[in-house]
């Protein structure tokens, strides 16, 4: 009944108007699983590779080759297989590709199939995806890390750091957390407008004002939290995504917006100063992806009390994560399904993190779709945190709305992670 009878891939558009892959998987009993693949702007050098067509069409960003690979090679390899055999199906696709980074068939092709297979199997079992993947113990609703001011590669402004986030740790429920985030978002919009800043939004729905420094952005957010009627640090904490690889040049951190260049040790000290001055509980990619010494310095400095998330550092890859664990580097992994390219490898990365007492943060990409799979995966893995953008743009809100539905479906079983995510 759960045998795969057909796989149909197509080229659709993501939230930036760029092509991406969508896959439908049909089963013998009529079940359908559909998944659309996200795409990043600031990508780690060690990520699995998206297959793009090149040429003039869509400025080289077309995905017809990846679509063709799904409709022919991948279908020939897994057609007829039982959709419940997720690990075996993912392994076959990895072997079929035959490269260490999925560059022949494309991680975008493989991931689309991997997620659609799981969704089809869940529908066949008459289970929500989070329950099918996570089992009976999947009930923890994540703290949303809401990216309300954008800089770096996500915005056209002088701010060096890529994301400034609010975390409603004092909320009672996920539904409350979304409300708190929304209220602060709208206060921030008024605050920015009153100071003459534009309130256009970036790729992830956050504002991209012409501020020149991290402290300036943090000050605006602190003021907005208080004006919305909440206590910074107690009810709402702050998070940063520095995306430091983007401004790491010749062994130094070049903060153009702030007009200074820092050695790795000084960069770690600067982040420690910010974490001491503001209620910052999480810093992502505080150091560059291959600056392992800088990462070690930062971890030694503030790792006991601040969540230090490896995104470009670990790229959702269990092998790189194990290296980091062995070296005592960072204490958390950002989980992006398209960085590694299959559901099986994604779940393995979360499990590896949890076994080492590292936290895991489920995450979107800057190029998203209306697909809300990561909302289910956040609950399935009980990871307790999700990054899926700001409180605007339907590609971001699709995930928040799905989590509201999941919380409602769980009823009294649902538990909001809240302040349990804090270190120290």
UniProtKB/Swiss-Prot annotation:
Any one of the GO BP annotations: glycolytic process
GO function term, MF aspect, one: magnesium ion binding
EC top class, as a word: lyase
Binding site for Mg(2+): 241, 284, 311
Cofactors required: Mg(2+)
Annotated cofactor note: Binds a second Mg(2+) ion via substrate during catalysis.
Binding site for (2R)-2-phosphoglycerate: 162, 336, 365-366, 387
EC number: 4.2.1.11
Catalyzed reaction equations: (2R)-2-phosphoglycerate = phosphoenolpyruvate + H2O
Active site per the UniProt annotation: 204, 336
Entries under InterPro entries matching the protein: Enolase, Enolase-like_C_sf, Enolase-like_N, Enolase_C, Enolase_CS, Enolase_N
Main localization category: cytoplasm
SMART domains for this protein: Enolase_C, Enolase_N
Pathway the protein acts in: Carbohydrate degradation; glycolysis; pyruvate from D-glyceraldehyde 3-phosphate: step 4/5
Keyword vocabulary terms for this entry: Cytoplasm, Glycolysis, Lyase, Magnesium, Metal-binding, Secreted
CDD domains: enolase
GO cellular component: cell surface; extracellular region; phosphopyruvate hydratase complex
Pfam families: Enolase_C, Enolase_N
Subcellular location: Cytoplasm; Secreted; Cell surface
Protein family membership: Belongs to the enolase family.
NCBIfam families: eno
Role, per record: Catalyzes the reversible conversion of 2-phosphoglycerate (2-PG) into phosphoenolpyruvate (PEP). It is essential for the degradation of carbohydrates via glycolysis.
The protein's name in its UniProt record: Enolase
Organism name: Rhizobium rhizogenes (strain K84 / ATCC BAA-868)
